[in-house]
Amino acid sequence: MERVMNIIKPKPDPKQLLRDWQRKLRQECRNIERQIRDIQKEERNVQKAIKEAAKRNDMVSAKALAKEIVSSRRTVNRLYENKAQMNSISMHLGESVAIARTVGHLSKSAEVMKLVNNLMKAPQMAATMQEFSKEMTKAGVIEEFVNEAIDNALDSEDMEEEIDEEVDKVLTAIAGETAAELPVAVRKERIKVPAQKASTSREEEAVAEGVDDEEELEEIRARLAKVRS
């Protein structure tokens, strides 16, 4: 009975499918733009916190916050890439519909399939693109495929070194001379030595202040994680 109903059921209009898909793609692009704005807004707050930490010579907090900014900016770059790929999907779908007017049906598009596959690897886009892939497979625009995980792992040491360089650039750009005046060895030493090892009364006071700083740092990290996800 189901096969009979499928035969009787008219094929969806390519133009209508295109309108529906492009509407969904535009909505996803707007969601990405909103997420980027939220991340950049939160980054401005983090920049203020970095300046305050640098003024009190708390380079542990300043560097940790700078690392969060580096991570956020990388997320923003990935979001812009996702948006660009969705715009490309919309463009290629328009071309497929134009061809369908001539041949009478939607043809498979290797480029759309490639773009959908790429976006399915992005955590923020995986669920949405899974739904898109089902609809497009059903309409004959792409072939059914299994999204295999691809190992894009880079050498951890090279990656860490690259991140450290970016962190230093962010610190210099935001904290300016305050961060630049501190020797590299001193900056690294401040990161390595735990606050609880302090023995003098002055250092003990710094530890007490550090507790509040750590709580503030965790709050900032939580807010950034929320807008990045």
Swiss-Prot record:
- Provide one Gene Ontology cellular component: cytosol
Q: Where are the annotated segments for Disordered?
A: 193-215
Question: Which InterPro entries does the entry link to?
Answer: Snf7_fam (IPR005024)
- Keywords on record: Coiled coil, Endosome, Protein transport, Transport
- Biased composition, Acidic residues: where in the chain? 206-215
Keyword Transport in record = yes
Q: Name one Pfam family in it.
A: Snf7
Q: How does it assemble?
A: Component of the endosomal sorting required for transport complex III (ESCRT-III), composed at least of VPS2, VPS20, VPS24 and VPS32. Interacts with SKD1.
Its biological purpose is as follows: Component of the ESCRT-III complex, which is required for multivesicular bodies (MVBs) formation and sorting of endosomal cargo proteins into MVBs. The ESCRT-III complex is probably involved in the concentration of MVB cargo.
Question: What is the protein name given in its UniProt record?
Answer: Vacuolar protein sorting-associated protein 24 homolog 1
Q: Which organism is it from?
A: Arabidopsis thaliana (Mouse-ear cress)
